[in-house]
C-alpha cells in the first residue's frame, strides 16, 4: 500500500494523500494561478521542493539556516486582547503590554499598534488617544513600530457613512450615481488616512501599515494609493507597507486608473509596480485560500502567484500569511503544520523578502511564523534588517549584507542568538533580556541610528522635545 502523508484541506481539516496525489494537486494549483494571472509555471524542481516540504515528517518545519526573513504584522495586539469570537484570545492587557510581548516574548522583528476597530475612519474621534499610546510604546520599544489599520472604504457608505451604497445604486441601474459615490468615498478615504497618519507620525510612529487594501474594490485601492502618494510626499522617511485584501482587485467601479493603469482586475504581479510607484517601501501581496481544496493545491497556487509578484516588484515583498491567505487554512487556530510549511515554502521557493503575519491566534500565527522563518527580532538582528528594508527599500539579500557589514559579522550570524546577544550588549543597541544599565527604548534606537546610518522618527521626536 502506498505511503500516505498528513496534509490539510483549505478549512484546516486533516486529509491523507499519497505522493502521487500531492504532486497532482501541486500541478493543478500551480496551473490555476498560471492561467488566471498569465504567469509562468513553477519549474519541475520547484514543484518537487514543495512536495518535499509538504511530506516532511515533523509537525513543525522551518527554513534552512541563513534564509530567515523579517516579519511584519496585521491586527497588532488584537490577537492578544481582542475577544470577538474570531482569533483574539481575550487576555486582559494593555496595548503597550501586547506590543512588548511581541517584541520580548515572541521575538517579532517589527510590530504595529492598532485600534480595536482596526480601520482608519473610526480612529478619527480617538486619534489623541492613539497618539498617546504610540508615544508610550515608542519610549519603551526597540523594534520598528507601525500604526496599522484598514482603509475599509465600506465604512463610507450608508448606513455607516455619508455616501449612498453603490451596490444599492447598481441594483437600481443608477450606474453613474454608483461611480460617483465610490469616487467621493475614495476621496474621503485618502483625506482621513493622511490626516490620521499626520497625527501619528508627529507622535513618533515609524510608519503605517495599510491592511487589506482594495477590500471594497478598485476605488478602495485608488484611494489608498493616493494616500500613500500624499504621505510619501509629506514624510519622505515614513515607513509604508501596503498589504492587499485579495489576489485580484475587484472592479466595483471599473474605470479608475492609477499612473495610467486600470486598477480593476489586477493580479499580485501587476499590483506591485503601482504600489511602489505610489511610494510604499514594502508590498504585501495576497493569494486567497480555497477552503474546498487541499493544502497542496492552495500552496502551489499561492507560491506561483507570489513568485511572480516578487520578480515584478521594485520593492521588498512581505507576503500576507494570515488565516485564509498564502496557502494557510481558513481557521481561527491555524494548524502549526500547515502554517510552518507555507512559511518555509514562501521563503525558499517564492523568494519573498518577508512575512506579513495576519489573523490567527498567537501560537498559530506569530509564534509559528517566527519559529519557521523569522529573524527573532532583538534576540538577534531581525529589527536591524527590517529597518533597512523600510528605510532604504532594500530587498532581503541587500539588507542582510548591509547590516552584516555594519556589525562586522557574517550574514549567517544575523539570526544567531549567541553571536548577537553579546554584540547587541557591546554596541548598546538593546537586548531582549532586562540588563540593568543597558540602553533601552529611545536610547537603544539612537545607537541603532548611528550604527546603520539612518534616522528613526521616534528619536527625532525625542530630540525635538529636549531642545
UniProtKB/Swiss-Prot annotation:
One of its GO terms (molecular function) is dimethylamine methyltransferase activity. One of its GO terms (biological process) is methanogenesis. It comes from the Archaea. Pathway: One-carbon metabolism; methanogenesis from dimethylamine. The keyword Cytoplasm does not apply. Disulfide bonds: none annotated. Keywords: Methanogenesis, Methyltransferase, Pyrrolysine, Transferase. It catalyses: Co(I)-[dimethylamine-specific corrinoid protein] + dimethylamine + H(+) = methyl-Co(III)-[dimethylamine-specific corrinoid protein] + methylamine. Coiled coil: none annotated. Its EC number is 2.1.1.249. It holds the Pfam family Dimeth_Pyl. NCBIfam families: dimeth_PyL (TIGR02368). Catalyzes the transfer of a methyl group from dimethylamine to the corrinoid cofactor of MtbC. Belongs to the dimethylamine methyltransferase family. This is Dimethylamine methyltransferase MtbB1. It comes from Methanosarcina acetivorans (strain ATCC 35395 / DSM 2834 / JCM 12185 / C2A). The lineage of its organism: Archaea, Methanobacteriati, Methanobacteriota, Stenosarchaea group, Methanomicrobia. The gene is mtbB1.
